[in-house]
Amino acid sequence: MSAPIEHTDPVPSAAVLEPFGRSGRALMLGHVHPDADVLGTLLALGLALEARDWSVVYGGPHPAPALLAFLPGVDRYRRLDKLDGRFDVVVLTDCPNPQRTEGLIDQAKSAGKVVVNIDHHPDNRRYGDVNWVDPTAAATGEMMYELLMALRVALTPAIATNLFTAIHTDTGSFRYSNVTTRTFTIAAALVAAGARPELVSESLYERRAPDALHWLGEALARVEVSEDGRVGWLALPASAVPERIVESEELVNYPRSVASVRVACLLRELDGSVKVSLRGKGDVDVQRIAAQFGGGGHVNAAGCTVAGPLPEATQVVLAAVRRAVDRKGTS
């Protein structure tokens, strides 16, 4: 394609649909530490394309976490160091920054005829040949549902389960303010197509090993709240971070659950850097905080990675959070 295509409406345009009009070889490319929104959408689209005689490769810089092993087709998603062969289309979902592919995006642009970027983050870099970015979507799973409907895909229980899980997790089990009537309408259609909410919830929240509860207790003992009660945080050293990345990310919701807290932070020491997850309650834009450290996200949910040891990173991030909270308190 000569010039990048941009589309922001909830329903995909003809230009978004065009790369999927004929069969070929496709790459479903994920980002670092893939979560349920990226995995669910890539798997759903890949399964739909395979039903139309496409050859599909699934993978990214990191493998799928054990917590999401129940997703249909996830066993085919693998860690990729390099890309082999050519692709008619390369699809990235829920990935606002191409740097999150750890260099695989550069290989993809060389190996793929068309790079399709589908995302709901408002700060998406528009790095694809086709860029469909809809910040009004609660999850990229909503957008993928619309794409499959526009392509006249018959939803299977496997596809429906992947998309339902994507939406379920990105809305905090339908608890967050990003949930709309559209969210529930799509979720209902996915349940009608064979997704089972009780099995998704059980797989995500009720299959812990006994020692996981002990680890959870140790982690929660580290929760701190500022003197004024408006900032809550949890700083985890590398020795305390489990392999189940998705589950540990949910820890940020514990300080967020404190009534007085306006911004909650989870800081996890990983590979010599600190991964930061930020959550707000609507009155402080945590995306702006994350942007100060090269990150991004949404108004109420954002993240970034900060260099340096955990104590120093915690101090720097909390200072930025306090400034944001104080500005809001005086505005």
Regions found by a protein language model. Give the residues of each.
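Hydrophobic helix-and-loop "lid/oligomerization" segment in the mid-to-C-terminal part
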Residues: S2-V32, G40-A69, D84-F87, H168-G329
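Generic detector of well-ordered alpha-helical packing
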Residues: V32, A36-V38, C95, H120, ...
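Short glycine/serine/threonine-rich phosphate/pyrophosphate-binding segments
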Residues: A36-L42, P98-E102
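Short, glycine/charged-enriched secondary-structure capping and boundary segments
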Residues: T41-A44, P72-V74, L104-A108, V130-V133, ...
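A glycine- and small-aliphatic-rich helix-loop capping segment at beta-alpha/alpha-beta transitions
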Residues: A48, D106-V114, A150, T181
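Active-site cofactor/cluster-binding pocket
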Residues: P72-V74, L80-V130
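A generic local secondary-structure boundary/capping motif
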Residues: R79-D81, G103-Q107, N131-D134, R152-A154, ...
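Short alpha-helices
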Residues: I118-I186
